[in-house]
From Swiss-Prot:
Superkingdom, taxonomy of origin: Bacteria
Role noted for this protein: Catalyzes the conversion of glucosamine-6-phosphate to glucosamine-1-phosphate.
Keyword Lipid metabolism in annotation: no
Keywords: Isomerase, Magnesium, Metal-binding, Phosphoprotein
Name under which the protein is recorded: Phosphoglucosamine mutase
Family note: Belongs to the phosphohexose mutase family.
CDD domains the UniProt entry points to: GlmM (cd05802)
Taxonomic lineage from the root: Bacteria, Bacillati, Bacillota, Bacilli, Bacillales
Amino acid sequence: MGKYFGTDGVRGVANQELTPELAFKIGRFGGYVLTKDTDRPKVIIGRDTRISGHMLEGALVAGLLSTGAEVMRLGVISTPGVAYLTKALDAQAGVMISASHNPVQDNGIKFFGSDGFKLTDEQEAEIEALLDKEVDELPRPTGTNLGQVSDYFEGGQKYLQYIKQTVEEDFSGLHIALDCAHGATSSLAPYLFADLEADISTMGTSPNGMNINDGVGSTHPEVLAELVKEKGADIGLAFDGDGDRLIAVDEKGNIVDGDQIMFICAKYMKETGQLKHNTVVSTVMSNLGFYKALEANGITSDKTAVGDRYVMEEMKRGGYNLGGEQSGHIILLDYITTGDGMLSALQLVNIMKMTKKPLSELAGEMTKFPQLLVNVRVTDKKLALENEKIKEIIRVVEEEMNGDGRILVRPSGTEPLIRVMAEAPTQEVCDAYVHRIVEVVKAEVGAE
């Protein structure tokens, strides 16, 4: 990771860390790096529903126009919608303004190349080098060589029509509950599932600029679980603020996470001859039960560092078509070049239809190990990982586990947090291991 770019683009508190001034420079320098070999390049921009989205969009657009790029605004749309449309509209670059599942005060900027994939480390390093220069030496076109801006608010519908044709039949006879996190999928997901003839109940579909991810969405699926039980729905689908994650709820109100969704997809794709190289790519955060279920079904797995960009890199390297994270980023590379909550939801409901099995039965074929993840706010992520007392308590706990479970201590890619995770045969043992490590992390480098 660089000085500005984290695991998922540039993030920060809007108007303090991620200022309009910085957004202008990111637009100008990012636009230049991605379009310098093209005459009159086209760049598309989407955003989620945050109040700061308009401010940052205006600054980004100005930066891009100053390089001579033509800018097309998509309005409110999901991150995978931008990824798809970048390639579908033959744009040289796509930009999404969002901080995903983060709270409303945060925002972020992430770029997609002309192929719809996130930027390489080399491209990000080139943009960062320009950001750090004291003098802006890039060309400044004038007159008719300046870029112009236009709106293409139909982009969301074009994207929905594309993902809709990935399923084999409609969803008539199913009652689907949706939680759109007051975010980018708020108008898209209800339209999509109603268009497929499902009965729908919705929540989190009234964005006001301030309520994105606030007690709703994929980070709060327990709220959707109540709606599923109240309405007697067959399935609940919870998206995050920018629509690149999915967490589901079965008909009994049980939460079905990204590991379980990946397993369900992998098993079905193997049975139907669609799973390339019989392999799923996941991260080190995936549950032990996920790997045991894959093994029992003759499916191999490939592990990466945490972050959907690392999953994607491994998928491209190995020629795999299914990967993702426990947090609900599911990548279906046959169809789209990033994690996609609505596409994953379509595939999950399609599997229910084709197998004629309820979600509880499909998810029940994987038994999760008890797991606990605690986030500790720290003063310095790097210092935490080098701290001798923290390293010692991790070693002691791992020895006590004796191979019956695991510990993972890692920094967040986007926030000043250390994540402490354990899996063990019982919840009680799991909790005890985590809290012992958390206490040492707090004592040594805690920010509170």
